[in-house]
Amino acid sequence: MCKKPYYITTPIYYPSTNLHIGNTYTTVAADAIARFKRLTGHEVMFLTGTDEHGQKIERIANEKGITPKEHVDEIVAGIKDLWKMMNISYDKFIRTTDDYHVKAVQEIFKKLYDQGDIYKDSYEGLYCTPCESFWTETQLVNGNCPDCGRPVEKAKEEAYFFKMSKYADRLIQYIEEHPDFIQPESRKNEMLNNFLRPGLQDLCVSRTSFTWGIPVSFDEKHVIYVWIDALSNYITALGYGQENQELYKKFWPADVHLIGKDILRFHTIYWPIMLMALGLELPKQVFGHGWLLVDGGKMSKSKGNVVDPVVLVNMFGADAVRYYLLREIPFGSDGLFNNEIFIKKVNTDLANDLGNLLSRTIAMVYKYFGGVIQAPTCKEPIDDELINLALSTPGKVEASIDALKIPEALESIWTLISRANKYIDETTPWILAKDEEKKERLGTVLYNLLETLRFVSVMISPFLTETSVKINAQLNTKVTTWESLKEFNGTVAGDKVVKGDVIFPRIDVEEKLAELEALKPAPVKPANEELVENPIKEEITIDDFDKIDLRVVKVLECEPVKKAKKLLKLKVDLGGEERQVISGIAQYYKPEELVGKYVVLVANLKPVKLRGELSQGMILAAAPSDDSELLLVNPGEMLTGSQVR
């Protein structure tokens, strides 16, 4: 029986250049969720695409001597190739240059204008071209864009504006009455306290300083700005504003917009207010995941630390990359991408745990029974723990995915894999094989292992798409439905397993690290379009204390670390960059006492994990020798990011 429709979206990506591992992370996560929902009986619409208009695209195309459309066509082809390589199963790929989208956006703009929510005025301010955002002088950080750190330029032009303030109170009420609308919880507090409650300014929604965009139908010297153009894709892709709205009626409102935290404001303030003005339902949830950090910070061409997913897939395969992104990165928090950790994770989890379980089991079925699966006719109490764990794991996985806890879902599956490996050691099939009278027991043990592998194969299929197919081929099974996991009997006695290649060969860590280092892009000198760095010193140890880099930061959020009485998790503003810091100050400060405070951060300590949480620095504090009290160093309300000398 088909369950209710399920609609999941990624952001539509800006095709100014090729996508990196961070973009891939969002799309792989959405794909895993979409595949899981299909597996469990939902009719799914999984949408991704590209946001193809804007001044930056126009400038890049002019520099290349081609049209903007020629430029985006080239980049979009590469994006689609990447998604094919990563086994992304999107149902629709929308481009904002698609005719149906252009017409629908023009209708949306006109409707908002006709009902008085959009008006014409002029705008003067400081403009960031890469972010396509206007800023006031007071909003700048060190004279640069507060979102990306790049230079801004003065701009004045006639423009249309959307009356954001008209709907602000209504949106605040909606967010408060729908606690799951913005997730994780910390993101909701950020939107309410930093943007909505202080008051909203009306939003500029058209431009006249460039032409690469959707013209306003009744005033064609204006092009419709990114907010209405790009955000509307989530409904225009379903047919909103078109004659056939069957998909819109079936799938809207979206179950989840999956986005990076850097575009949360647009999706949780601009977009819902636009929908309110149109009289449409709001999406059920907007989930803002964290960033993928490389070398302790965000990826940047100027640092030469941008990770190319194509290189990784060509070297290690799509499933290895998918597994690391989905298992190792805490969904909702920042996570570390590190080549050495990645390779070691492939060796331990995929080659050792899963790969060895499969190869050992298939080899024993061939060695002792010529590859023929035996009926489980000689059960013993030791079997029950494995069987009961197998039967209970699908429910745990489903609950984790419903809560968007992807790493926890994979952890549950790997708990079963580990238990199966332990079961081999406990039952010692090689000893049973020496006793002819225990042949029936040996057959039962191997059946239990094969059936456990079948469970594993079904459950990993949304995450490791190619691996699941390979396991099924060696098990010689076609029983791959989610429903089949309700009983531990899907493996058919009398069938014959099939010998196959090792699914994850072990990797020589040093050799592959050297290859990756050789392929690493050289740092690019920052230009106007690149991030202006305020460089942090090299990573240090305590022995290098004289090199320590102290920075002023503002505490944005603070909460206890689970199962760690002494630790607090802080999100701090480093001046255009947010960081997560784990600090052992819980016995001295309550979380609510720290929010809004300015403190000093040791900014160039190597990122580490403490109790499973990423810590990107250390808060400076003073304490007497008996630790009877602890005082945080107070720099006063200096600009965030300022160095302490």
Curated annotation (Swiss-Prot):
Which Gene3D superfamilies is this protein grouped with?
Answer: 2.170.220.10, HUPs, Isoleucyl-tRNA Synthetase, Domain 1, Nucleic acid-binding proteins
Known cofactor(s): Zn(2+)
The EC number(s) attached to this protein equal 6.1.1.10
- Enzyme class label: ligase
> In terms of one coarse class, where is the protein primarily found?
cytoplasm
Q: Which GO terms describe its biological process?
A: methionyl-tRNA aminoacylation
Per UniProt, Zn(2+) binds at C128, C131, C145, C148
> Can you name a GO cellular component term?
cytoplasm
> What does the note accompanying the cofactor annotation read?
Binds 1 zinc ion per subunit.
Pfam family of the protein (one): Anticodon_3
Q: Which InterPro entries match?
A: Anticodon_Met (IPR041872), Met-tRNA-synth_bsu_C (IPR004495), Met-tRNA_synth (IPR014758), Met-tRNA_synth_2 (IPR023457), Methionyl/Leucyl_tRNA_Synth (IPR015413), MetRS_core (IPR033911), NA-bd_OB-fold (IPR012340), Rossmann-like_a/b/a_fold (IPR014729)
Molecular-function GO terms, alphabetical: ATP binding; metal ion binding; methionine-tRNA ligase activity; tRNA binding
Where in this protein would one find the motif 'HIGH' region, according to its record? 13-23
Q: Does the keyword tRNA-binding apply?
A: yes
Q: Could you list this entry's UniProt keywords, alphabetically sorted.
A: Aminoacyl-tRNA synthetase, ATP-binding, Cytoplasm, Ligase, Metal-binding, Nucleotide-binding, Protein biosynthesis, RNA-binding, tRNA-binding, Zinc
Short motif ('KMSKS' region): ranges: 298-302
Reactions catalysed:
tRNA(Met) + L-methionine + ATP = L-methionyl-tRNA(Met) + AMP + diphosphate
Question: Record's NCBIfam families?
Answer: metG (TIGR00398), metG_C_term (TIGR00399), PRK12267.1 (NF008900)
Q: Spell out the family assignment given in the record's similarity comment.
A: Belongs to the class-I aminoacyl-tRNA synthetase family. MetG type 2A subfamily.
Q: Give the matching HAMAP family.
A: Met_tRNA_synth_type2
Q: What does the UniProt record say this protein does?
A: Is required not only for elongation of protein synthesis but also for the initiation of all mRNA translation through initiator tRNA(fMet) aminoacylation.
Q: How does it assemble?
A: Homodimer.
| Name the UniProt record assigns to this protein | Methionine--tRNA ligase
Q: What organism, scientifically named, is this protein from?
A: Clostridium perfringens (strain 13 / Type A)
